[in-house]
């Protein structure tokens, strides 16, 4: 059953929680996705069958949570994730971050040291506002963003275009994790498809090279795309989480 958490910022965050043993598992979704996605629901079913505590939620402006998507940013969604973890979980947690959720997982891990027992990134996209958006734009696109404040981009996942605002990009620049030391003192596993055109494997390799971590491994899956939601990919995801839990 969907429940709601009202944060200190007044945002109403939709969530679904499965009670069970710890360390718990928390799923952090991607940009414009929600907690009814394939990976989130698959993980809930896995958690229920294994008696594992599990939390999935919608960032503000996503899914059933309050707010308009166009008015949110990395800082808001990071704050939502922190609020959800602090209010709804106890003890150590394993974070599972998909795409943008991988970036937010890293921000949470940095902020809640001692609460994070492990991290699984699925096509993790740290710093994507800078590296995969702004740096890839033409001079004309940058001029549009600077002048009118927004840019419309076609989306492969929706009939509606992505509206990218200069405010969103500027907010992202305040939360970059690959420009300063990144200490991850727990098991980290990165899962990445070789056919991912949204977040290429080079991002995972850069994260792997940048982070200081005693136990970090990257698994590349040939032919897997950004969704990483085929039955084989989902099985690999749960097997990887189980491995992290054994080492947590």
Per-region residue spans from a language model:
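Short beta-strand element of the alpha/beta-hydrolase
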Residues: 22-30
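N-terminal cap/lid segment of alpha/beta-hydrolase-fold proteins
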Residues: 1-19
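The alpha/beta-hydrolase serine catalytic core
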Residues: 115-220, 225-248
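The serine-hydrolase catalytic nucleophile loop
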Residues: 31-44, 202
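Gly/Ala-rich beta-loop-alpha elbow adjacent to hydrolase catalytic centers
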Residues: 97-105
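Short beta-strand immediately N-terminal to the catalytic nucleophile in serine-hydrolase-like folds
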Residues: 95-97, 122
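Catalytic nucleophile-loop/oxyanion-hole region of alpha/beta-hydrolase
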Residues: 63-88
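Conserved alpha/beta-hydrolase
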Residues: 42-66
């Amino acid at each position: 059953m969907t429940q709601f958490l009202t944060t200190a910022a007044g945002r109403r965050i939709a969530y679904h929680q499965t009670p069970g043993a710890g360390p718990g598992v928390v799923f952090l979704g991607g940009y414009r996705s929600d907690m009814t996605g394939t990976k989130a629901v698959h993980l809930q079913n896995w958690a229920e069958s294994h008696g594992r505590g599990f939390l999935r939620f919608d960032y503000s402006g996503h899914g059933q949570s309050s707010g308009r998507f166009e008015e949110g940013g990395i800082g808001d969604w990071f704050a939502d994730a922190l609020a959800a973890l602090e209010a709804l979980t106890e003890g150590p947690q394993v974070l599972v971050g998909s795409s943008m959720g991988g970036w937010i997982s890293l921000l949470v891990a940095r902020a809640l040291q001692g609460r994070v027992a492990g991290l699984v990134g699925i096509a993790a996209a740290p710093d994507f506002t800078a590296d995969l958006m702004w740096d890839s734009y033409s001079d004309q696109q940058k001029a549009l963003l600077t002048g009118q404040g927004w840019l419309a981009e076609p989306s492969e996942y929706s009939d509606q275009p992505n509206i990218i605002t200069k405010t969103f990009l500027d907010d992202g620049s305040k939360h970059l994790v690959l420009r300063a030391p990144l200490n991850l003192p727990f098991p980290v596993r990165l899962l990445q498809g070789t056919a991912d055109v949204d977040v290429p494997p080079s991002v995972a390799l850069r994260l792997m090279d940048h982070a200081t971590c005693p136990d970090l491994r990257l698994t590349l899956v040939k032919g897997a795309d950004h969704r990483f939601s085929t039955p084989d990919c989902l099985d690999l995801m749960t097997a990887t989480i189980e491995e992290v839990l054994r080492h947590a």
